[in-house]
From Swiss-Prot:
Its EC number is 1.3.1.9. GO terms for biological process: fatty acid biosynthetic process. It comes from the Bacteria. The record marks 75 as: Plays an important role in discriminating NADH against NADPH. This is Enoyl-[acyl-carrier-protein] reductase [NADH]. It comes from Shewanella loihica (strain ATCC BAA-1088 / PV-4).
């Protein structure tokens, strides 16, 4: 079939398998160009490995460190008449290139929140790898099915305490608008912590530890975003921020456990990037368009892959073997470049001056739109979008 982009709200409802493969190859090449990771991991489990920072982590481990990788994700395969999700095609492409490079790659397409996913991952690790020396936790989901009761819990992107009003961009119409979001109820806050907090990360690490499939020096990392005062009301000071604070709680508990044998658990605070997850957050597209332009001008711009490669090389697996620099909450900070005073002051000054008319001139909004479509495999120069493509792509994945 011939596949063209169709967007609805903050998602693109179509995806292009050849475009997704081109994206993955680009990220692999960025990683290879950075050179090998000294003392890097060799057997890595990535929970949430099909897009965004999770996919970048799997690529960094495999193509930066020569690691065997097991990826866990929840994606839809394509059918004769309908493309699959971008994450399906990303994972298929990763698997293809990993195997071409002689690297072990297996994937589980399932609900990562379930007990079954954890058991299946443990079985595969025991059977094929023995133990893993790194576990990356990178799930971004609006819903969690509680593994014991089967109850569906939903997260909320809402402020706490008062209605949030701000300038934003309507990415469908390319218009600057005023947006307002009603505050979360106590129940919504609690539910957001249940879905996006640290509980499932703990369940994973505890299950893996009890099964004896973690090396004594295993490192685990989960991803967070803190941002700045421009995004705090909807993010860090909102319901999602409470969930990310719970991730910090889990990191401390897990670090106490793993450090006893020489392992570690950290939250890594990452920079804002164009992902399916960030595009759903009010204000983020406009903030990203502003901050990207300034960071590009300053030579500080990083995409998902560059950011994760820096985490591997300069934080977790330093060539000198030194412990990584952490903040006062034991977090790895990769948002340090974005948070530089001159970058943030520029955004604060620019924010009130943005109009529909000057949006493309004063920010990288056009680039934001291009990056967004690229997530789904569109707008890539090397791809012929008038060519017939097969939406059914199979690879080494177990589904349950």
């Amino acid at each position: 079939m011939i596949i063209k982009p169709k967007t609805r709200g903050f998602i693109c409802t179509t995806t292009h398998p050849v475009g997704c493969e081109a994206n993955v190859l680009e990220q692999i090449n960025i990683t290879k160009a950075k050179g090998p990771v000294a003392n890097g991991p060799k057997k890595v489990l990535v929970i949430g490995s099909s897009s965004g920072y999770g996919l970048s982590s799997r690529i960094a481990a495999a193509f930066g460190s020569g690691a065997a990788t097991l990826g866990v994700f929840f994606e839809k395969p394509g059918t004769e008449t309908k493309p699959g999700t971008a994450g399906w095609y990303n994972s298929a492409a990763f698997d293809k290139f990993a195997k071409q490079g002689g690297l072990y790659s297996k994937s589980l397409n399932c609900d990562a929140f379930s007990h079954e996913a954890k058991q299946k991952a443990i079985e595969l690790i025991k059977q094929d790898l023995g133990q893993v020396d790194m576990v990356v936790y990178s799930l971004a989901s609006p819903v969690r099915k509680l593994p014991d009761s089967g109850e569906l819990i939903r997260s909320s992107l809402k402020p706490i305490g008062e209605t949030y009003k701000s300038t934003a961009v309507d990415t469908n119409k390319d218009l600057i608008i005023e947006t307002s979001v009603e505050p979360a109820t106590e129940q919504e806050i609690e539910d957001t912590v249940t879905v996006m907090g640290g509980q499932d990360w703990e369940l994973w690490i505890n299950a893996l530890a009890e099964a004896g499939v973690l090396t004594p020096d295993c490192k685990t990392v989960a991803y967070s975003y803190i941002g700045t005062e421009l995004t705090w009301p909807i993010y860090w000071h909102g319901a999602l921020g409470k969930a990310k604070m719970d991730l910090d709680r889990a990191a401390h508990a897990l670090n106490d456990k793993l450090s006893a044998t020489g392992g570690s658990a950290n939250v890594a605070v990452l920079k804002s990037v164009v992902t399916q997850a960030s595009s759903a957050i009010p204000v983020m597209p406009l903030y990203i368009a502003m901050v990207f332009k300034k960071m590009r001008e300053e030579g500080l711009h990083e995409g998902c892959q560059e950011q994760i490669n820096r985490m591997f090389h300069e934080r977790l697996y330093r060539a000198d073997g030194a412990a990584p620099a952490v903040d006062d909450a034991n977090r790895l900070r990769l948002d340090d470049w974005e948070l530089r005073d001159e970058i943030q002051q520029h955004c604060r000054d620019l924010w009130p001056t943005i109009t529909t008319e000057n949006l493309s001139e004063l920010t990288d909004y056009r680039e934001y739109k291009e990056e967004f479509l690229k997530l789904f495999g569109f707008g890539i120069e090397s791809v012929d979008y008038d060519a017939d493509v097969n939406p059914e792509v199979n690879f080494d994945v177990e589904q349950f």
